[in-house]
A protein has these predicted regions:
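Secretory targeting signatures
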Residues: 1-11, 215-242
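Cyclophilin-like peptidyl-prolyl cis-trans isomerases
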Residues: 2-218
């Protein structure tokens, strides 16, 4: 397990974008069945915290570059908590869970050590790694917070040997899609499986955070601000697996 102290020299990346952080885009769709809400489609833009969670981000980016997540769906959805994905066996199309009942228990072949940085917390839209009882058992499953979930933070767990869950990114655009997807009807069992899939069409790496030049009326010289710039360039991962 790897831990990093709070840095007083700079604001938390949860609150401010930093130049060089990778940007990924989740393109998702939800085709609602009768009585199961409205269709959902669009992009969720996520900033990854490379300097604060380097092992976790590198693992996630590597899987994205392999198209690991393309074609799977969010197998666990809980309104006002999280939506979780990353099991490569969760690919069935149609009513779920009529497919493989083991969906939600699997991941990639390699696990990574737990990383914690006190600057990274479970605010609304935080992206973290799901894992088993072993803090170093995370592989490919991840979740997106629907609302603040600080009970998952390092230091806020009830058991002394539970370090919490590793945050490695945050949603910068598309929280309306997260909130809509978190409200889809689910099965009446502890697995909270959507009756119809919230489908990940693709997760793609779309450049990184770059400085933006802003012209002002008062000054002829430009000022430098930071914004999310999605570029078409290559950059060159309670929650337990069910």
């Amino acid at each position: 397990m790897l831990f990093a102290p709070v840095s007083k020299a700079e604001p938390s990346p949860m609150e401010q974008s930093y130049e060089g952080n990778p940007i990924v885009v989740i393109n998702l769709t939800y085709e609602a069945g009768i009585g199961c809400g409205d269709d959902i489609r669009g992009d969720i833009v996520i900033e990854l915290f490379l300097n604060w969670a380097p092992i976790t981000v590198s693992n996630f980016v590597g899987l994205v570059n392999e198209s690991f997540y393309d074609g799977i769906f969010f197998h666990r959805v809980i309104d006002d908590f999280v939506m979780q994905a990353g099991d490569p066996t969760c690919t069935a199309i149609g009513v779920y869970p009529a497919s493989d009942p083991s969906c939600g228990s699997n991941g990639s072949d390699e696990t990574i050590p737990f990383e914690a940085d006190a600057n990274l917390t479970h605010i609304n839209g935080a992206v973290g790694m799901a894992r088993g009882l072993d803090p170093d058992s995370a592989s490919s499953q991840f979740y997106i917070c629907d609302g603040s979930q600080h009970g998952l933070d390092n230091g806020n767990r009830s058991q002394e040997d539970d370090p919490g869950y590793a945050v490695f990114g945050v949603v910068r655009e598309g929280m309306d899609l997260v909130q809509a997807a978190a409200q889809v009807p689910t099965s009446n069992d502890p697995l909270n499986r959507p009756l119809y899939e919230v489908h990940i069409n693709s997760i793609t790496l779309n450049g990184d955070v770059t400085p933006e030049i802003e012209e002002t009326e008062e000054e002829e010289t430009p000022s430098i601000g930071f914004s999310l710039s999605i570029l078409s360039i290559g950059f060159v991962a309670l929650l337990r697996r069910n």
